[in-house]
Amino acid sequence: MARKSRGPKAPAVIRFLIALGVLALFVYAYLSPGLLSNGILALLVKGQFSAALYGAGLAGIVLVLLALTLIFGRLYCSVLCPLGTVQELFWRVGGLLLRKKGKQERGVARRGYAAPSKARYAVPLLVAAGVIFSFTPLMVIVDPISTFGRGMGALRSLFSQGGGTTVFTLACALAVPLILIVIVALLRGRAFCAWCPVGVTLGLFSSAAPLGMKVSATCASCGLCEVKCPAGCIDSKAKRIDSERCVLCFSCTAVCPTGSAAYGVRGWATVSGEARRVFLKKAGKASLVCGAAYLLGPSLKLFSRPSNVALASLSEGETLPILPPGAKNLIHYTGRCIACHACVASCPANIITAKDGVHPHLDYSGDATAACQFNCIECSSVCPTKAITRLSVEEKRRTRIALSTLYFERCVVKTRHESCGACAEVCPTGALTMVAYSEPGIPFLTMPIYDERYCIGCGACLASCPAEPRAFTLAAVKEQSLTVGSRPLEEAGDELRVENTGDFPF
């Protein structure tokens, strides 16, 4: 039986607390709407490796992360990756549950050393190919921030839209990858990190880092560090730590009874020439993968995914999803979106959803507040990959994302001979105005008329309409464009432009 641990616990505790702090910021930013949380979310998401690699103008972040990894090891995985911290958190919870049941003392193995599989190198290569050819589904499936973001988006859907059957089903579908990873983490720790495209890529650089975890000659091969390692990268019999898979959790230093596991210089000068060549070869491969993905991606958009041909042939209509303002078109949007769901979290109106399970879009089927706010640019502000291009408030006010269709035969003015005008009152651009309407035997009324030149597809008319079924429908446009702007009051002529007073007239 191993002696009581005499290793320094401070590094492991401090590192874990920092990682928990970063995770707490992520959870707060995803689940708490507001300008502060959106600012934090934009900063955190744009600092993620895959988002920076795939995003425009974020090459500096990629280079900084690679440089830090090349010197210190996988610091990014240690404290900045929220999915890694989630795995480690549940790994610790699993350990407490096993300890409570006494199973650890009866020899139930939790992780232990697992020989690395060379097949894992195929994951970042395939993802890099997807980045180059604008094929994001591969990244969406295996990327850590995408997986974590969809899980948080699922929780937000439950909180913001209630617990209906449809919402619950959607939330479960979005969270399935995260749930599976958490279940595996209970017993196998950070097993996903061995196959994560970001982890594998950074691992190549980490293997060449002069600093890292090392085992001294005083190691007694007791195996305690091997069992406690959430990454399964310690071979206690061989007295070796796999620097590629080590996530710098410092658990080994905290439990080592002889103090043999430590972080420091790994003896670069004493490494054989052959080993150095292996290190440099791995780092070179990683550099080529990252460089090709970042540099060639924008220039090879002509090699778009095959499904783009089908998407381009779709006509305007309800078959197209209504995309967030700044998404340009479906090809651009799906070719850059990594499904981190930061836009879902940032939307103050809670109308950005992901009913297709991957790429978010606008859903106007909710309550009466379900309209894209006229002055809001939050989704374009937090998007890390420019799938939603950044818009100014003035550009947002003129960006057409959909077109309304007015069915006057459904309007309460026509069906119930009641005064209304709610649609014209809430329309922010003046696409809807009121004109005189009369029928024999009914009092003087006004009716809405619609001018699509001013319509931006915000959905305010649909949200405010009291008719059943509603007198408006919305259809996405194939290509977002700028309208002529809002209708000036002096151009209304004989039309009666209803001023927005903040209250519906019924």
What are these regions (language model features)?
Residues 1-239, 244-245, 250-506:
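Non-ligating segments of multi-cofactor redox enzymes
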